[in-house]
Amino acid sequence: MQILEEKPKEGIVKVKAETLDDLWHLYHVIDPGDVVYAKTLRKQAQRSDSLRAEKVEVIPVYLGVKAEKINFHKFANQVRVTGPIVYASRDDVPLGKYHTITIEEGTVVTIQKPRWKEHHIERLKEAIEASKRAKVMIVVIDEGEADIALVREYGVEMVASIRRNLGGKRYNTDRESEEKRFFHDLAKTMAELMEREKIEKAIVAGPGFVKEDFHKFLRENYPELAKKVVIEDTSVTGRTGIYEVIKRGTVDRVYHENRVAKEVQLVEKVLEHVARNTGLATYGLREVEEAVNYGAVETLLVLDELLKGEHRERIEELMDAVRYARGEVVIVSSEHEGGEKLKALGGLAALLRFRVK
């Protein structure tokens, strides 16, 4: 994401969305009541005279829309902002009519808020920093099967699955040739994805010895790709295996700082404290508020959905109080396993400096 212009006194920030992750961040930055400005297309009825029927034309126009509905469509790679028009660059576009501005990769958009809050500013900073970091690829592999996922800023995206029937005995000649074809297919898919997504490293993991066999195959046949691969153990394959890699901290070790890895590990830490009844973690709005009032919160975990819910202002007050007490606030994406587990806890949890009960 690029910040193109800032006018703090007017509450205006102009940005350019460059990736799907940027769209995810913008979805969480734009709130109901904000005014969003962008170039857009609008259907406009044109009538040349009273005897002719109206002709509908699609016209390019620069509009400002007061946001009422904000939706993130990750499969369409779009954020859609719907609301009444409050500004139009053309006089023939009536104000007050409803319009949907579609924000896509490459869209330049201006956001005007009554007040930019701390978590909004942090979101934009995160998006800018994320654009400088490599994305994470995880490949989980076993005999004749491999799944590839990208760990994006908003969550885990399964991007490819490769399956090949290798036949029976392990050292059968046909089996060996089928395994080589399987390895070639996987290597080519990885290379294409890494080039397209500008990925510098890939974690290859699995429960058996196939991952080592594949790595050896890469060293012999795709040496440049082999240099970008890190090997890790998992007990299972599939999506569960991918999350196992994240929980083990491999992503952090390879990429140092990754949002999803950090969020998943923090939620797991909360669950561990709760299971052991240490008193150093709490969850639920009332319980977390009590811990905040004692100044006991070291890390506050907030599910992103809560910042668009009915308790939004109450949650934002808690976030400000934790920051004032020099605690850390982490907004957890609802798009990954850690977010799902936090949602089961009510969407709000905290790691504590000391026991409050």
Swiss-Prot record:
This is Protein pelota homolog. Keywords: Cytoplasm, Endonuclease, Hydrolase, Metal-binding, Nuclease. The keyword Cytoplasm applies. Coiled coil: none annotated. One of its GO terms (molecular function) is endonuclease activity. NCBIfam families: pelota. Its cofactor is a divalent metal cation. One of its GO terms (biological process) is nonfunctional rRNA decay.
